[in-house]
Structure formats: structure tokens, C-alpha cells
């Protein structure tokens, strides 16, 4: 059974990643109304008779979301039953399921009540939490923490501050990026790093949205760079923290490069999808570090208790 659960966890993680990228594809191609204002049916039909490209993209996104719902539900039930001895399993199972349901409801709301940029941005943010929760659940199932000896990990307050702070801030940056996409502001500023050669400062809403996201992205790049330097200097003996920050910096660098290329490739589809891919992976890695941070507090208490008993 455990072998089956491992395969299920991998397939579920991939399915949720496809859902995230599918949502970006729907937005990029303007396929949000490919099934009209009908949900869960498509144009009022179970199998739509008129299959335009927009309809195919939107319908495919709904089907992958539906399959993800089934897989996540099954994974939550089985992990709860067979891995309940692991402290975070129940919490992650609940988060995975609750945010998947919330994601589906937000998607339905976007279809029925209109493609409001704020609603669509929230839809992506909720999807990201569901994806990260399933990734963490998968890590627990594969016992990644044991391979890195994470159970003995103890971090100082400074490192935990950076982990929690960067993760929360990353989530806020995600919303600024989602707002850029849903406000159709990806090409509002044709140059980089300034908005335009003729007028470096933004002058209208779409330019402010674009430049606000750029400033937020630059700050998270600098913050992750600083945290990585701290990890390299002080956590070489803790490979999970050491490599966690290095991987985070690689991902945020790739994210930045792709973000710049979005501007210079006229917001090509490939760049837009890669932009969504890298931020999804970055957020998942940061969430894993958060989980390690919560464990560190427990490990520190246990170590202190053991030290008192030996004395």
C-alpha cells in the first residue's frame, strides 16, 4: 500500500502543477469564457458541440482540476490513515483538501460572475497553497526529512525569521504577479528595469501595477540572496537548510530572468508558463523550509529537556 501511496503522491503533485500551468494558459490565451458562463457544464452541455480552441483549453483545465480533486481527496484519506504518526500529516491533508475546494469554488465564481482580476489573482494564490501542501505531503510520504536528518535540525531565531518572512512576502509577490497577468499589464512597460526610455516613471494604472510587481520581485531576489549567504556561512552542517536556500536562489534567479524575457519576447506563451512554473516551485521549497522551522522549535525543546534530564 505504501508503494501505491508514493505513486499517488507523485501523480497528484504533477496533476496539481498541470492545473496551475493550465490556469496560466487559460489566462494567457483569453480562454476564461471558453465555456461561457456555464459551470460545471460547458456552454450548457456535458460535451460541448462547438469546440473552439478557447473551449478546448478551458474544458481541459476543468478536467485536470476535476481529476486533481479526486486524487487529492484519495491522497488525503490514505496519508491520514497510513502516515498519521508523522506530526504534520493531518494538517497538510486538511490544507490540501480545503484549499483545493476553495480553488474550485473561486474558479466557478470567476466563470459565473465574470473574470474580475482580483478574483482571478486570489484563485491562483489559493491554487498555490494547495499545490505546496500536496508537495509537502509527498515529501513526508517519501521520508525526505529522514534522509536529510531534519528531525535533529535546530535553527536560530534569525534564520527562522528569514524563512517565515520570505515565504509570506513571496506569497504577496505572487499576488502582484497574478494581478499583472489578469490586469493585462504584462507589456505595460516595454523596457527594463525602468518602465520606458522616454518616461522612466509609470503614469497610468497598468504601468503602476507592472512597476509595483518589479520592485516587489527585486526585493525578494535580494532577500533570498541574503538568506542564502547566511545559510552558506552558518548551516553547512545542516544540508537541508543549506541546499534549501541555494535551490531557492536558483529558482528566484530563473524566475527573474524569465520575467525579464516576458517583456522582451512580447509576453510569449512559453515565458509566461515558465514564469508560473518557477514561482510555484519556489513557493513549495520555501514552504518546506517553513515546515522545518516549526520542527526546529520542537527539536530545541526536546534537546533542552534531554539536557536537563542528563544533568
Curated annotation (Swiss-Prot):
Q: Where in the cell is it found?
A: Cell membrane
Active-site residue list? 58
**What are the GO MF terms of this UniProt record?**
metal ion binding; oxidoreductase activity, acting on NAD(P)H, heme protein as acceptor
Q: List the disulfide bonds.
A: 35-42, 189-195
Specify the protein name: Heme A synthase
Q: Which InterPro entries match?
A: COX15/CtaA_fam, COX15/CtaA_HemeA_synthase, HemeA_Synthase_type1
Describe, as the record does, how this protein assembles with itself and its partners: Interacts with CtaB.
Q: What does this protein do?
A: Catalyzes the conversion of heme O to heme A by two successive hydroxylations of the methyl group at C8. The first hydroxylation forms heme I, the second hydroxylation results in an unstable dihydroxymethyl group, which spontaneously dehydrates, resulting in the formyl group of heme A.
Bilayer topology reads: Multi-pass membrane protein
State which pathway it belongs to. Porphyrin-containing compound metabolism; heme A biosynthesis; heme A from heme O: step 1/1
Annotated catalysed reactions: Fe(II)-heme o + 2 A + H2O = Fe(II)-heme a + 2 AH2
Q: Where does heme b bind?
A: 213, 275
Identify which cofactors the protein needs according to its UniProt entry: heme b
The GO biological-process annotations, alphabetized, read as: heme A biosynthetic process
- Family, similarity comment: Belongs to the COX15/CtaA family. Type 1 subfamily.
Query: Which keywords annotate this record?
Result: Cell membrane, Disulfide bond, Heme biosynthesis, Iron, Membrane, Metal-binding, Oxidoreductase, Transmembrane, Transmembrane helix
* UniProt main location, coarse: membrane
Q: What class of enzyme is it?
A: oxidoreductase
Q: Does the keyword Iron apply?
A: yes
Query: Domain comment?
Result: The N-half (TM1-TM4) and C-half (TM5-TM8) domains are connected by an intracellular loop. Each domain is formed from four-helix bundles and they align in a pseudo twofold symmetry manner. The N-half domain is the substrate-heme O binding domain and the C-half domain is the cofactor heme B binding domain.
Name the Enzyme Commission number(s) assigned to this protein: 1.17.99.9
Look up the signal peptide feature and give its range: none
What's a GO cellular component annotated to this UniProt protein?
Answer: plasma membrane
Ranges of the Cytoplasmic topological domain? 1-6, 84-91, 143-159, 233-243, 293-311
Amino acid at each position: 500500500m505504501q508503494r501505491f501511496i508514493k505513486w499517488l503522491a507523485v501523480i497528484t503533485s504533477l496533476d496539481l502543477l498541470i492545473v496551475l500551468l493550465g490556469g496560466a494558459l487559460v489566462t494567457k490565451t483569453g480562454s476564461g469564457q471558453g465555456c461561457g458562463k456555464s459551470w460545471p457544464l460547458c456552454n450548457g452541455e456535458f460535451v460541448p458541440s462547438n469546440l473552439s480552441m478557447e473551449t478546448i483549453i478551458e474544458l481541459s483545465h476543468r478536467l485536470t482540476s476535476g481529476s486533481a480533486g479526486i486524487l487529492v481527496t484519495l491522497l488525503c484519506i490514505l496519508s491520514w490513515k497510513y502516515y498519521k504518526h508523522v506530526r504534520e500529516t493531518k494538517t497538510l491533508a486538511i490544507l490540501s483538501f480545503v484549499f483545493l475546494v476553495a480553488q474550485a469554488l473561486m474558479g466557478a465564481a470567476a466563470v459565473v460572475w465574470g473574470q474580475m482580476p482580483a478574483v482571478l489573482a486570489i484563485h491562483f494564490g489559493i491554487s498555490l497553497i494547495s499545490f505546496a501542501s500536496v508537495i509537502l505531503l509527498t515529501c513526508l510520504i517519501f521520508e525526505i526529512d529522514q534522509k536529510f536528518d531534519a528531525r535533529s535540525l535546530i535553527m536560530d531565531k534569525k534564520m527562522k525569521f528569514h524563512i517565515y518572512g520570505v515565504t509570506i512576502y513571496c506569497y504577496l509577490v505572487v499576488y502582484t504577479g497574478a494581478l499583472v497577468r489578469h490586469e493585462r499589464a504584462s507589456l505595460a512597460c516595454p523596457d527594463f528595469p525602468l518602465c520606458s526610455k522616454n518616461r522612466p516613471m509609470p503614469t497610468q494604472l497598468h504601468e503602476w501595477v507592472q512597476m509595483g510587481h518589479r520592485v516587489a520581485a527585486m526585493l525578494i531576489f535580494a532577500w533570498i540572496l541574503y538568506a542564502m549567504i547566511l545559510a552558506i556561512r552558518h548551516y553547512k552542517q545542516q544540508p537541508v537548510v543549506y541546499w534549501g536556500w541555494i535551490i531557492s536562489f536558483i529558482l528566484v534567479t530563473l524566475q527573474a530572468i524569465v520575467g525579464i524575457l516576458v517583456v522582451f519576447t512580447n509576453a510569449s506563451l512559453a515565458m509566461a508558463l515558465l514564469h508560473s512554473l518557477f514561482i510555484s516551485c519556489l513557493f513549495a521549497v520555501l514552504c518546506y523550509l517553513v515546515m522545518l522551522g516549526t520542527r526546529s522549535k520542537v527539536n530545541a525543546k526536546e534537546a533542552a529537556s534531554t539536557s536537563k534530564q542528563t544533568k
